[in-house]
Amino acid sequence: MDTSKTPPATATPPVEDERVWKAGRLAPMPIRKLPDAPPSVHILGPTVFLVALGVGMGESYMWPRLVLLFGPEIRWLFLIGVTLQAFVMLEMARYAMATGESIFSGAARVFKPLMWFFFIVAIAVYIWPGHLSAGAAAFEEITGIPWTVTAVVGLILVGVVFSLAKVIYNVLENVLSLLIGTLVLGTAVVAAMVGSWGDVASTLSGMFSFGYFPSQAMSAAWFPVIVGACAFAGPSGMQQMWYTLHLRDSGAGMGAHIPQIRGLRHAGQEEEMPARGFMFDTEDPAEMAKWKGWRRWVTFDALLLFWGVTMLVTISFTVIAQSAVRLNPGVREVIQGDDREVALTAMANAVSHAGSSVLGSVFLGFIALIGLNATLGLFDSFSRGQADMTYHFVPGAKKLGMSRLYGVFLWGVILFGILILLFGPADGPSGILDTLAFLSTFAMGAYCVTLLLVNNRMLPKPIRPKWWTNVIIGFGAVFYLGMLFYSLFAFGVVVG
């Protein structure tokens, strides 16, 4: 898929009395030409970042665990969660492709403190290297190398690769596409080898058991776990918001007018970043035809590449979990416990008995791969988001340039992560874990509200969302915030 930067950011010089689109409290957006859309059907694209962030412990552990606890009928909640995420993705893309701005800038146009809320939440939630633990622990099971060594080396390697890359987006898109392709095909093959058609049928049919909710799920022990699993059906926390930055760097829509972020080694070659985004002429039929082409392109991204891949990986892991319990009934009790690493190792052992020890190692390799995907995606996305907000809204930050700010945040979170891995709890201080979990889930409801405000107030009427789209995004806000606060007030627990 080629979404090259055409025209470049410097190709359209300002003219006197140029037309602009006034949106909110920031500088107006000059009118520019919308690039032609690429073919709708494609393989690679910015969605690989969302898949890398979204296909994690929710898909490989949390949902298989709930299926074993409450039966496959509980998966209707997963279907709602991941489908809702696909609609959120399309609405994030609406603003990013129409303006070349991130959703953070859109939030600032509505109410600048709203943007700073997301800035603070990102630091509070995503500086902890806990997402590395499962992958590194799985790698230790395979190789015997201590997981802390693997995690520290992995962090340094990520920093070096991103720093040396000429254009970070291009390198990361290719690497993540390869890793995710391996994960999708590999888990499907293992599931086919150890599972049965009965496992597949029950997993699929359970997604349509709408309304099923066993009484034992309405307890302080399990309702927060279900809330957490719904929040982690696909990308969680602020990961959808970061997707707008990857869209921009891919050159999607008006992002073609915005320079790409470069590695530190090539930061001096960076073009000047404009202080605001751009808008196309929504009264021009030719421009609107191109806009519809871009919407078809991103819809393919959302439905097939995001929704389809996330669903396939979750089905594969659920089939593996069901077959593991059938092969070794003792695995059920282990998976029902709270120790994620022990549960995954038990599943690997059961898979080994089904074929050979190689299969068990392959399964653990997939868990390690998930950890690597999450590390690459999270560190890049966090650094992009913080650099974007700092560059545009912190006085004096423009002197450093976007690429250098990206490098500062990247190496800052890497060094902090190394210190925590060596001297502290990888998931963060236990006393604030509930607060972090609350903020992560709360951010998802908050960005649904933000989307409604930004897309319905900051965009021209011809490209604003339809009423039914607003209803779905509004339902998302109620879905996330409603479950979160019900869990908090009914059971005194945030999420599990």
Task: Report each predicted region and the residues it spans.
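Membrane-interface "cap" regions at the ends of multi-pass membrane proteins
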Residues: M1-Y61, A256-H257, G263-G277, K290-T299
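Juxtamembrane transmembrane-helix boundary signature
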Residues: L50, L77-G106, W116-P129, G377
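Extracellular/periplasmic helix-exit of transmembrane alpha-helices
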Residues: F87-Y95, E271-A289, T310-L344
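Hydrophobic transmembrane alpha-helices that form the core helical bundles
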Residues: A98, P113-G144, A151-L155, G371-Y391, ...
